[in-house]
Every structure is written in structure tokens, then in C-alpha cells.
Design a protein with these regions (language model features):
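Basic, Gly/Ser/Thr-rich N-terminal segments that form RNA-phosphate-binding interfaces in CRISPR RAMP
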Residues: 1-276
Length: 276
């Protein structure tokens, strides 16, 4: 079985909601249940690519549409998009792309790379990062927390090599990811992924009066711009990848497209990889 990896780099905030919630956020984003990391559901990936597919091969590649008398499964399996790097505010260097050993290990396994060990992260107040994010030579202020920076150039170079596979981030990503990557402990990464997403207030307007409806204030959670996800695709029947119409570029995924949310740059990783 052959597989490919799709990268999603969010050019605008992304909202793929999980429905109404009883918490403080009315419409939170979908998350991995055990890590709390935001995800892009496989159904969303499949749906947006199906919408871009040529009609002549749509059912063959993606399967029959619901309600059709003769049903057929698709020739490609689409997995959920997993978080790879998440932007966090930094007092120096504007922002960092946060990641952690769990994320790096999972991704490195899929692309056939080895991930280094991060012994300093047993102390959750430490991070691996470039010295350019330091405010006093050895500490960085990320969001509202101060971390001790471990400037291990060997580890950072190996992590940068893993991220060099990503091509969809454009000039911002390619020009600075080596200086902005920050490796946090798994615990701190999960905390930031849960708390550093934006929560935006909205109100429903009454068309007849032009003013807000009573009780119509609501909020939605969004994954910030400059986030990076990856998703695997598996070829269930030989030649299916060759029939895909979309070959990379800009697409919109998730809700609130008319207000500019969900625009992503998308790229496919290298050659087909054999699934072990």
C-alpha cells in the first residue's frame, strides 16, 4: 500500500468546530481526545478534495455520494490532520513555532527519520530553542511564561532537518523556521494547544431591524494562522493518486469561509512512501 503526506499551513485562522459545548466556548475546535491538540478531521480533508475533483473521476476516487443507488467505496483513505507546529507569542523574535517530542516522534516515524532525544525536557521549565528568542541570554518569555533555553545546536539542527520536508509554508516558513522552532515538553505543549487558540466573539444581526438579536451573542474558537498540520493518505487501489485533480496550492477548509477563515497552503511530501 502506498501513502502520501499532505501538509496544511494555515494562512488564516482555522475553525473546524465540534458542535455546541457546555463550556465557556460555544463552538470549540475539534481536538484529539487524549492530547488536546487541534485536529483536521479526515472527513474534512476528503470533502474539500472531493469538491475540487473532476466530475468524471469523482466517484471512482472518493466513492459514491450519499443517496446513490449503487454505492462504491473510494480508492483513497484520508486520515485526520495532526498538529506539527503551533505558533506562540514570544517577547523576542515575535513568535515561535512550538512542538514537542511526542509530535516530532510520531511525524519522524511516518517520514522515515530519526528524532533526537531531549533530556532537558524532564524539567518542564526548559525548552530547546535558538538563542535569538532569549531576552537575557538564557531565558525566553513565551506567552506569559518564562522558560530556560537550552541552546543545543546539534538537536536544533536535527529538528530543522525534519521540518525541512515542509514546503507549503512559503517564504515566512522557509526563511525563519530554523530560528523560530521551540521544543517544549509534552505537558507544556498540550497546555498551550488547549489555551492559546483564539476565541472570537460574534453576534447575530436581525435582518429586519439591522441590530443585534436579543441573546444572540456567541463565540467561536479558532486555530491561529501560521499553524502547521499533516495528514496521511493511503492508496487503496493502484493508480488512485494519479487521478487526484488537486496537486497542491491554496484551498479553504472548515467553516466561515465567507469571513476568511480556513485558507491553507497545501503541499504533498515528496514521493510515495511504502507503508510498513
Amino acid at each position: 500500500m502506498k501513502s502520501k503526506i499532505m501538509f496544511f499551513y494555515t494562512e488564516t485562522p482555522l475553525h473546524i468546530g465540534c458542535g455546541n459545548d457546555v463550556g465557556a466556548v460555544d463552538s470549540p475546535v475539534q481536538r484529539d481526545s487524549h492530547t488536546g491538540f487541534p485536529i483536521i478531521p479526515g472527513s474534512a480533508v476528503k470533502g474539500v478534495l472531493r469538491d475540487l475533483q473532476d466530475d468524471s473521476s469523482c466517484n471512482e476516487v472518493f466513492g459514491s455520494a450519499s443517496g446513490e443507488e449503487l454505492s462504491k467505496s473510494g480508492d483513497i483513505a484520508f486520515c485526520e490532520g495532526k498538529l506539527l507546529a503551533f505558533p506562540l507569542r514570544s517577547m523576542k523574535n515575535s513568535f515561535v513555532w512550538a512542538t514537542c517530542p511526542y509530535i516530532l516522534g510520531r511525524f519522524a516515524e511516518r517520514i522515515g527519520c530519526e528524532v533526537p532525544r531531549f533530556p532537558a525536557l524532564s524539567d518542564e521549565s526548559k525548552i530547546y530553542a535558538d538563542s535569538s528568542v532569549c531576552v537575557d541570554g538564557k531565558h525566553a518569555v513565551i506567552e506569559e511564561y518564562t522558560f530556560e533555553v537550552v541552546p543545543d545546536t546539534g538537536i536544533l539542527e536535527r529538528v530543522a532537518e525534519i521540518f525541512s520536508k515542509v514546503e507549503c509554508g512559503g517564504r515566512v516558513w522557509r526563511g525563519s523556521f530554523g530560528k523560530r522552532i521551540a521544543i517544549f515538553s509534552d505537558t507544556m505543549m498540550s497546555y498551550f494547544a488547549k489555551t492559546a487558540c483564539s476565541v472570537d466573539q460574534h453576534v447575530c444581526i436581525d435582518d429586519s431591524t439591522g441590530i443585534a438579536k436579543d441573546g444572540a451573542l456567541f463565540n467561536i474558537e479558532t486555530v491561529p494562522s501560521d499553524s502547521l498540520f499533516y495528514s496521511e493518505m493511503f492508496e487503496l487501489r493502484a493508480g488512485a493518486f494519479d487521478k487526484l485533480t488537486f496537486g497542491g496550492g491554496m484551498l479553504q477548509i472548515g467553516g466561515d469561509a465567507s469571513t476568511g477563515l480556513g485558507f491553507c497552503k497545501v503541499d504533498f511530501f515528496g514521493k510515495d512512501c511504502s507503508d510498513d
